[in-house]
Structure formats: C-alpha cells, structure tokens
C-alpha cells in the first residue's frame, strides 16, 4: 500500500507544480500594470516613456538622488516594464518557481513534493500576495529580491567549494544586489553572512576568501541603499522632520505593530496551525508521512 502511495506522489507532484505555475501565470495575466508601475514606465523626472537601457540608467540616477535608494529593485522593475506585460507574466511565474526551488535547496529537500510544498507556502502564507507578487512594483521589490537574497544565503549556508565554481568573482555582484535589496533584508543577510564567517573561524580557524568578499559587497550595497540622498529628500517632503524624535519613534512603532496585526499575525496563526496538524499526522503515522514525501 505504501509503495502505491509513493508512486502516486511521484506522478501527482509534477502535475500539481505545473498546475500551480499555470495558476500563477494566469493571475499575473489578469493583473495589469498599475499604480507605481505607470510612473516607473517613464524616465521619472518627466512623462517620457522609457525606451531603452540608457533611459533606465538616467532614471535610476535621478531616483537615487531624488526619491530613494532601492536602485537594484527599481532598475529591475523598469527593465521588466520595458519588456511588456506578456514577458512580465512569464518572468514573474518563472521567478515564483525559482524562489520555491531555492527554498528547497537551502532546506536540502530537493524532490518534487517538497518543491510543491514550498510553492504552496509562498502563496498560502503570503500576507498580501497580490501586492508583493503580482503587482509588478511589489514583485520587483519582494519576489525578485527574495530570489537574490536566497541565492546569496545559499552560498553561505550550503557551502561546498567543489560545487561553486568561480564564486570569488560572481559573489561580488550577488552580494551587492542582496545588500541593496531593501532596508530590512539587506542588513539582515549581511549580519547572517557575518555570523557564518565567525562560526567558520571558530570551527576551522579561517574562512574562504569569497566569504569576506561577499560580506563586504553586501555591506557596501546596504550602505549605498540606506545612505541614498533621495531617502533624505523624500523624508523632508513628507514633513517628518516637523515632529520630535520621540514622536517619530512612536509613530514608527505604531505602524509596525499595526502591520504585524493586519498582515503578519494571520500568516503566523496559519503557520502554527499547519505545524500542529503536521505534528499530529507524524505522530499518528509513526514517521510514515516523511517516508512518503521523501520519494
């Protein structure tokens, strides 16, 4: 009986993954470019539509000095917008699949049932899937940047020198993009990469050169993002400086707490419920569930 179940899982998993990809593509197809996408389709400082890579470079230079420091995410956004909605739908679908696979690689669970499970969690536990995965500006900032972040973390968490040819070279741009991703995860992955280096020093008395290079480039990306002149220009336009430091801290904490309750808490509640159900199933079947999914 168990062998039949394993065989069924082998056949069903790729079908479910393909169905998930089709659904993700279709949702992308139904959601058109909107809101900030319309502005980022221009050179930003004028209503002129972007036509080529040169326009994007000029737009991002203006953006960096006048609006904000997320240059990597917004340059990628403009490239996707330039490609058009048809290609954006395909790229977004491919990035969703890749993100799920990267999660499986980091977890060292590289079989199709795990891939489908990862995709299910990316969609099912997403606090606001429309605005973070299917709205193009949100996808560029969170879906695509999450891919770069996981790729960078994979190098540090699953390091095997023989499987990472040329890493001394390509870890530099990868670290720069990861650090330059967004104001929360950029510093977080830098700290995690630093922790890995410290642990390797404790265990092996040294760390590979590429780890230092990646850490430094990640830190450089984070600094370039946070210290962007546009951040201060935009902050001045919002009138935040009119409030005292203590009041600004209160407003920020209130906004964070509200965001946690509205977006993060439901996802955390669902995660806890799923873990309890899975734990119960494992206890009931005496590890049979793990045997089945590990086909």
Question: Where are the model-predicted features located?
Answer:
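Membrane-interface alpha helices of multi-pass inner-membrane proteins
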Residues: 167-189
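Short hydrophobic/aromatic helix or loop-helix immediately within or flanking a transmembrane segment
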Residues: 62-86, 90
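Transmembrane signal-anchor helices characteristic of membrane glycosylation enzymes that use polyprenol
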Residues: 8-35, 39, 218-229
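Membrane-interface micro-motifs in multi-pass membrane enzymes
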Residues: 118-157, 182, 295
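Extracytoplasmic loop-helix module adjacent to an early transmembrane segment
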Residues: 23-65, 77-78
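Transmembrane-helix motifs of polytopic, lipid-linked glycan transferases
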Residues: 90-113, 151
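Perimembrane helix-loop-helix junctions
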Residues: 188-216
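Conserved small/polar residues in nucleotide/adenosyl-binding loops
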Residues: 284-290
């Amino acid at each position: 009986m168990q062998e039949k179940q394993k065989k069924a899982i082998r056949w069903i998993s790729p079908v479910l993954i393909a169905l998930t990809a089709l659904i993700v593509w279709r949702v992308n197809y139904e959601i058109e470019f909107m809101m900030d996408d319309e502005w980022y389709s221009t050179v930003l400082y004028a209503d002129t539509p972007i036509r080529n890579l040169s326009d994007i470079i000029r737009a991002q230079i203006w953006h960096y000095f006048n609006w904000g420091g997320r240059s990597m995410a917004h340059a990628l956004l403009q490239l996707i917008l330039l490609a058009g909605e048809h290609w954006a739908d395909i790229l977004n679908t491919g990035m969703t699949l890749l993100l799920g696979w990267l999660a499986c690689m980091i977890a060292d669970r590289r079989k199709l049932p795990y891939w489908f499970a990862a995709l299910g969690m990316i969609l099912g536990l997403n606090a606001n899937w429309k605005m973070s995965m299917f709205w193009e500006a949100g996808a560029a900032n969170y879906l695509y940047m999450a891919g770069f972040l996981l790729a960078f973390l994979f190098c540090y968490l699953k390091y095997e020198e023989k499987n990472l040819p040329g890493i001394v070279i390509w870890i530099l741009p990868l670290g720069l993009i990861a650090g330059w991703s967004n104001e929360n995860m950029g510093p977080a992955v830098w700290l995690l990469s630093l922790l890995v280096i410290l642990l390797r020093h404790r265990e092996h008395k040294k760390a590979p050169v590429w780890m230092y290079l990646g850490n430094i480039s990640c830190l450089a990306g984070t600094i370039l993002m946070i210290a962007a002149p546009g951040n201060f220009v935009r902050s001045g336009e919002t009138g935040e400086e009119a409030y005292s430091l203590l009041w600004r801290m209160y407003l920020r904490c209130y906004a964070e707490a509200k965001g946690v309750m509205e977006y993060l808490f439901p996802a955390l509640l669902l995660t806890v419920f799923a873990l309890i159900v899975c734990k119960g199933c494992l206890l009931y079947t005496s590890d049979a569930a793990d045997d089945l999914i590990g086909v």
